[in-house]
Amino acid sequence: WSSCQRPTMLDFALRYAGENRVELEKVLDHYRNDSLKYRAAVFLIGNMPYHYFYTGAQLDSLRQGYRWMQRTGLSAKAVKHKLWKTFGEPDVRRWTKRNDARSVTADFLIRHIDYVFGVWEKRPWASYYSFEDFCEFVLPYRIEREPLEFWQEAYVRRYGRLCDSLCAVNPDVVFVASALNDHLRAEQNWYASSDLSFVEYGALQLLDERFGGCRELSGFNVALFRALGIPCGIDRVVQNPHRKASLPVELL
């Protein structure tokens, strides 16, 4: 996500949206008298042409891997081969590419913006960050190319009370983030394997099923932190010291 300079990025996004332009303009009209939320809407809409996701029957089937593991008791690698044998290897040509600018509805975006602002405004560290930091590291409705869905509320239901209690002990954002990470490690309910990392999973699925490699774990953590109003993003270590590959890491 990059900072949006009106009119260039916003105007381009509205033109690019095609028939969906009316939905995006509804959002802008809705916030016409709220300067901060209007700027947030401009930021999100201006970035939409550069974000997309895929849909398709094969993709939905391939996302069943963890459920197959639970049902059959097979390893992640065995389930991967079974999925590919049943539904075919992942093939983007069988999926439909959908751009955010042409897919996001006014109801979705308004609900998202209102919810994120509601969480952010009650966090004691909100005043320490610029509005630009908020837009970049808390506001986005997606992380990568996962399904388009409203996920924040489910994360807050699961972890919001814990976050509030930690804020009451120490309102420092680093303390709260570290304590949340300690709690997640203590839960010990993440099935660590990259064998099922051949498609992208939504934040709601990762909240319920807790599986995957570095990409999925980073996505889950960023979704959780942002849902709780903790600024967070993903960077990439170019060279993993333990193997010949790069890996994503969360940054606070």
Tell what function each PLM region has:
Residues 3-4:
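N-terminal Sec signal peptide cleavage junction
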